[in-house]
Design a protein with these regions (language model features):
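Serine-dependent carboxylesterase/thioesterase catalytic core
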Residues: 1-51, 65-68, 73
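C-terminal catalytic-base region of ester-bond hydrolases, centering on the histidine
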Residues: 47-130
Length: 130
């Protein structure tokens, strides 16, 4: 596998997961992925080029479980999707669940899989490229 695209993945760990993990009544939701979701991944050093598409429409239940300091998709903060060693990173206007239905996210994923980088964003804002 040469290229991988992650959609809204909290590669750097998840505040929502850390908050869920604090209580026995909700920690079970995280299952066997608890440690990874709470702590994040080590810097990427694998052979495949990895790109992340993050969302910036803050909708979803995650807003009830965490207060994000910066932009988020309502479940995962944009900052939580960044990880040293990524080949590229971009953001689109979508919620966490909306990323899988977003035409812009699909177009960006296709560009990364084809070219190894995300397409330039027409209206570049402070969070559009990393």
């Amino acid at each position: 596998m040469r290229r991988v695209v992650c959609l809204g993945s909290p590669l750097h760990g998840s505040l929502v997961a850390r908050n869920l993990g604090r209580h026995r009544a909700t920690a079970w939701v995280l299952g066997r992925s608890r440690a990874l979701l709470q702590g994040g991944c080590p810097p990427w050093q694998g052979q495949a080029r990895v790109g992340v598409v993050a969302g910036t429409v803050a909708r979803g239940a995650g807003r009830l479980l965490a207060r994000f300091d910066g932009p988020s998709d309502g479940t995962v903060a944009v900052a939580e999707t960044r990880l040293p060693g990524l080949a590229d990173h971009c953001v689109v206007a979508a919620s966490h669940t909306g990323l899988v239905f977003s035409r812009e996210a699909a177009d960006q994923a296709a560009a990364f899989l084809r070219d190894g980088r995300f397409a330039p964003v027409a209206a570049a804002g402070p969070y559009n490229r990393a």
